[in-house]
Curated annotation (Swiss-Prot):
Protein name in UniProt: Outer capsid protein VP4
GO cellular component: viral outer capsid
Family from the record: Belongs to the orthoreovirus lambda-2 protein family.
Catalyzed reaction equations: a 5'-end diphospho-ribonucleoside in mRNA + GTP + H(+) = a 5'-end (5'-triphosphoguanosine)-ribonucleoside in mRNA + diphosphate; a 5'-end (5'-triphosphoguanosine)-ribonucleoside in mRNA + S-adenosyl-L-methionine = a 5'-end (N(7)-methyl 5'-triphosphoguanosine)-ribonucleoside in mRNA + S-adenosyl-L-homocysteine
Localization: Virion
Length: 1058
């Protein structure tokens, strides 16, 4: 059985902007961003450029004037190489700003602008009847009801349809458009039936099973090949949609069936329509060659035409001969009926037939292989050789390897609701600092912030990361089995977020089984829903940290501000349905029923108050700093005055902004407030937005301010990037010795006999490689290897022409793996926050060391696996002191590395520090070599002894990391993160034993007394971008909440002796 999250989401309507947004879209102040506004690729083999626009511009009709813009001449300027990013972005930005669309602004926020008609009218230079009408009455492009988006034009012009050419998705391809979409004036099914019958007499026409805007449209093709390509693409989209839902993925879909229906076509299209309706087993078994989609589908249709299974053969032939009928399963029908129930006025393709797929169960492909083989690649080979030619990997088809953007991740329900807080510690806010902080805040606001953070956030949204978990919860419930959970628990709330139906409890710990035959709806969510639910959990925990029930108390209320159509309101109502007299209210300046439309500050004649307020109102970006500042102050004071406990979003949490909020609260008239900054695990992981928690307290205490806050630091260091972030690449050429590779993967296939040499050559860039064959009779082997910056740093210490070819020769032919089923690989892999923090520290130290002169060596204490080699300049000797360190003698000789397999002596009298040296003590002083925890005083003694010994040396630098005591307070009041937590007053990180933390004040006082030069340094946003970009990794979904606190309270001491 397969289930949908939502079939009522018209994605095309959602892309239509508000009339007042047109100028912002066509006159963007910021330059276009890769992945957000456009996608660009260059194929060196074909010498072809592909530029695809995203957002509203993906549906754009270009005029002859547009084609004359320098943007469209760039492929001619760079016929055989990639267009420089700066030149591409500058020209794209220039072209966007040259676009002028006729429109009429409106303060009615329920209106949308018909982008399709607007850009079509412009592309004709307003010479068509539609264009002339738009010139005369531009307001006709505004609509409230989607079905009225075109009706007003039809009525005004007295026409039956509008033909609009569909532009190639690659805007650099200026060839003729493959087809026109014809928008019909057919408001009722009577007209729809008449038009569909009429189109059967036309040539090369198709249509959908349902229509965007609820307006009938048909596709009219210029050639049979264009129709075949369009049909094939939509079949693949439909099959993939069904496959996702078969697996329980909760994704939004704008129609139940994506396949097209041929109204007048050819025998080729009839064959495609028939095979598309069958949902054949060959697709789920991944045996189709998707690189030749149309050909593969037609070949598959021939197989079913003469299939050995008589039922399948008859069903295929029936579908072929009756291709104008939309064949669907009983589940399809059920979903369509649900659409009709939700919207009785919906228009649907009327000629349908229900068939069963129960007999399509034969599995014709079995996986009998041994699986893929992962090879650990040697650092240095044993065979000397001269130069080796580049190795070129051949392309792999999509049915063998699929490359997706981000690795899926697993997360527990309770982790979704984790949060971290940071409390103020300073009792004054000096006037001179106020002036300085305001200057910093204004400068950062005006220059905007990191494009890389925006790209990482947009690579995959938080709801995409959390949907697999919610999908599993939904499937468990939909099976109808009895489920045990406590009413009011996090599991209960998660079930409410997954299922759009009432949950019935038997007693307090058991959910009643579903009635036989009842299929519950899956809950529709947006990207903010789980964040709002986690904020609800946070505000309940802040009310009573020890509580395990998250139900509201009787006779209490909560307001969710900024709710336009926020599903969290209904989810919380169902979650709290067992509690008497609970009010859960959604409010926003664009809210629709059942939420309440209201602006902040609240009207003076409205007595709006609640026990809790969660405010998710965004600050508009296209306003001055002062306007944004005033708007934020107004929202904060409104929420603080309206509720006992508030959580308020701060889009620009500069130190000046947060301290100004606290100062404003101090002037509200005799009320004393406790404040704290909060981040949740269900926010976008790279977001710097934060929430301020506000609650009045009875005691007349002074207001505390922030100084060097962990959470604020994310925003303050998110400065604008000089360059766009690098998306991990797919490399197909393995050079013998090159330091020009960007982060990413080597991926491709090669003949079996060449595989050993390919593996040997990959050792220069990768620490592991995976191989497998898909056909024992084939001579090809597939290879995947992820670039490892640490391996590159090791390889390029000295150039050594050594090969491990003969070592890998033993793998041929049967040691290379065998796997038939499709393999998925990912450009970005998820990593825990502790791993990313370590990489951030390395990036920070590497930058510091790069500025150091006249040093001869870097000495790593405890660097047993050479993990910190990436910070060592190629010209310096690398020494590792660790009793567990092991590395081949050959590698030491070739790479200028020295291994001392012993424990480092921290006694000041015997410490053997050398001049002209850099020492690394990363994650070392808090544990002994055997893993036991080191007491706090012993840790301080170790730091003291290193500093004291350095005073007797010259030109010596040390980097020492430690855990600062402030993290205990922060994590003790927080619920995230499992891999970093407090146990009995000590800090437990990952699988290590809990250790003592050190007060920073005690450490710095001791260093001042010794008289050594020191600096406390901390990794921040630039290092986060560096680590994730260099290694092709992403924070796990809960890492964004705790990363800032862990970075801040895991600093590095830099000791310097000149």
């Amino acid at each position: 059985m397969w289930h949908y999250t939502s079939i009522n989401n018209d994605t095309r309507v959602a892309l239509d902007p508000k009339p007042n947004q047109i100028r912002t879209i066509t006159k963007p102040n910021t330059v276009p961003q890769l992945g957000t506004d456009y996608l660009y690729t260059f194929n060196p083999q074909r010498r072809s450029h592909t530029l695809r626009l995203l957002g509203p511009f993906q549906y754009f009709n270009f005029s002859e004037t547009d084609r004359g813009h320098p943007l469209f001449r760039l492929p001619l300027k760079y016929p055989s190489k990639t267009i420089p990013t700066d030149e591409l972005v500058d020209n794209l930005h220039s072209w966007m700003r040259s676009v002028h669309l006729l429109h009429t602004r409106s303060d009615d926020n329920s209106l949308r602008y018909n982008w399709m008609l607007g850009v079509y009218a412009r592309s004709t230079n307003y010479t068509t009847p539609v264009g002339q009408l738009v010139v005369k009455t531009p307001a006709i492009l505004n609509y409230a009801n989607p079905q009225d988006a075109f009706n007003s034009v039809f009525i005004a012009l007295g026409i039956d349809y509008i033909d609009i050419p569909i532009t190639n998705s690659n805007i650099f391809d200026d060839g003729s458009t493959p087809y026109n979409v014809r928008i019909w004036h057919a408001p009722t099914m009577t007209e729809v039936n008449h038009i569909l019958t009429l189109m059967r007499k036309s040539t090369l026409v198709s249509t959908h099973s349902s229509w965007h805007w609820n307006v009938l449209h048909t596709f009219h093709y210029r050639s049979e090949s264009d129709m075949i390509d369009h049909f094939s693409a939509k079949i693949l989209e439909d099959w993939r949609q069904k496959e996702k839902f078969d697996k329980g993925a909760l994704v939004e879909a704008d129609r139940v069936i994506q396949r097209l229906i041929p109204l007048s076509s050819s025998t080729y299209v009839q064959r495609l329509a028939a095979i598309g309706a069958l949902y054949p087993n060959e697709f789920t078994e991944n045996v189709l060659d998707l690189s030749r989609l149309s050909t593969a589908l037609l070949q598959l249709s021939d197989t079913y035409y003469q299939h050995a299974n008589d039922q399948l053969k008859r069903l295929y032939r029936r579908m072929y001969n009756d291709s104008r009928t939309l064949y669907m399963t009983a589940r399809h029908q059920e979903l369509l009926l649900a659409q009709v129930a939700a919207n009785p006025n919906i228009l649907l393709y009327p000629y349908t037939h229900i068939f069963t797929t129960a007999h399509i169960t034969a599995s014709y492909i079995s996986n009998t292989g041994q699986g893929r083989i992962k090879h650990s690649l040697a650092v240095t080979g044993t065979t000397e050789h001269s130069t080796v030619p580049d190795i070129i990997l051949g392309p792999t088809s999509e049915d063998v390897i699929t490359i997706s953007m981000v690795e899926p991740m697993s997360i527990a329900a309770e982790d979704m609701y984790g949060y971290v807080i940071d409390t103020p510690t300073r009792d004054i806010w000096p006037a001179d600092e106020q002036v300085e902080q305001k200057g910093d805040a204004v400068a950062l606001y005006d220059t905007k912030t990191s494009r890389a953070l925006g790209m990482f956030n947009n690579t995959v949204r938080i709801d995409d990361l959390l949907s697999p978990l919610l999908g599993r919860v939904y499937r468990t419930y939909a099976k109808g089995d009895t489920m045990a959970m406590t009413q009011g628990s996090l599991d209960h709330q998660t079930l409410c977020a997954a299922v759009d139906s009432d949950i019935t409890f038997v007693g307090n710990r058991m959910i009643a089984p579903l009635a036989e035959g009842y299929v519950p709806r899956a809950m529709h969510r947006n990207n903010s829903t789980m964040k709002m639910l986690s904020l609800y959990v946070a505000i309940k925990k802040l009310e009573n940290f020890a509580a395990n029930s998250y139900l509201m108390s009787p006779d209490t209320s909560i307001i969710l501000l900024g709710a336009e159509r926020e599903p969290a309101v209904n989810i919380l109502r169902r979650f709290n349905s067992s509690v008497s007299n609970v009010r859960i209210i959604g409010m926003g300046d664009r809210a629709v029923e059942p939420n309440i439309r209201v602006r902040v500050p609240f009207p003076i004649d409205k007595n709006i108050s609640a026990d809790f307020v969660i405010c998710d109102i965004n600050s508009y970006e296209d306003q001055s700093f002062e306007s944004m500042f005033g708007e934020t102050m107004s929202v904060v004071t409104t929420c603080a005055s309206a509720a006992t406990r508030s959580l308020v979003k701060i889009n620009h949490p500069s130190e000046y902004m947060i301290n100004s909020v606290i100062e404003r609260l101090s002037k509200l008239g005799g009320v004393f407030y406790h404040t704290a900054l909060l981040k949740t695990a269900s926010q976008n992981t790279y977001s710097y937005e934060t929430y301020i928690y506000i609650t009045p307290i009875a005691a007349a205490v002074g207001f505390l301010f922030y100084n060097n806050s962990a959470i604020i630091n994310r925003y303050m260091t998110a400065v604008a990037d000089d360059e766009a972030p690098v998306i991990p690449s797919i490399h197909t050429i393995i050079k013998e010795h090159s330091n020009t590779y960007s982060p990413g993967l080597f991926c491709g296939c090669i003949d079996v006999q060449s595989a050993p040499l390919a593996l040997s050559q990959l050792k220069s860039y990768c620490s592991e490689a995976t191989t497998w064959r898909v056909d024992s009779d084939d001579n090809l082997v597939n290879i995947i290897a992820r670039i490892d910056p640490a391996r590159i740093a090791l390889e390029f210490r000295t150039r050594s022409n050594t090969s491990a070819h003969h070592e890998y020769q033993r793998c041929v032919p049967n040691g290379l793996g065998f796997k038939i089923r499709k393999t998925r690989e990912f450009r970005y892999m998820h990593r825990e926050v502790t791993f990313i923090h370590k990489l951030m520290m390395y990036a920070l130290i590497r930058e510091q060391i790069s500025l150091t002169e006249s040093m001869t060596q870097v000495v790593s204490i405890g660097g047993r696996n050479l993990a910190d080699i990436s910070v060592v300049p190629l010209t310096m000797k690398y020494i590792v002191i660790d009793p567990a360190a092991r590395i081949e003698t050959l590698t030491q000789e070739k790479k200028n590395i020295e291994i001392q397999a012993r424990a480092f002596q921290f006694d000041a009298s015997t410490m053997d520090l050398e001049n002209n040296s850099i020492y690394l003590f990363i994650a070392v002083i808090m544990n002994e070599p055997n893993g036991a925890a080191t007491p706090a005083q012993t840790q301080i003694d170790k730091i003291r002894n290193v500093a004291t010994a350095m005073l007797t040396r010259t030109n010596c630098v040390a980097y020492i990391s430690f855990y600062e005591s402030g993290i205990i307070t922060r994590l003790s009041q927080s619920t995230a993160h499992k891999t970093i937590r407090v146990e009995d007053g000590r800090l437990k990180v990952a699988n290590y034993v809990p250790v003592d933390t050190l007060p920073e004040a005690d450490v710095t006082l001791m260093l001042r007394d010794i008289g050594i030069t020191y600096e406390i340094i901390r990794p921040s946003t630039p290092e986060l971008v560096n680590a994730c970009s260099s290694y092709g990794i992403r924070l796990g979904s809960t890492g964004g909440a705790v990363l800032d606190v862990f970075n801040h309270y895991s600093p590095v001491i830099k000791l310097v002796r000149s």
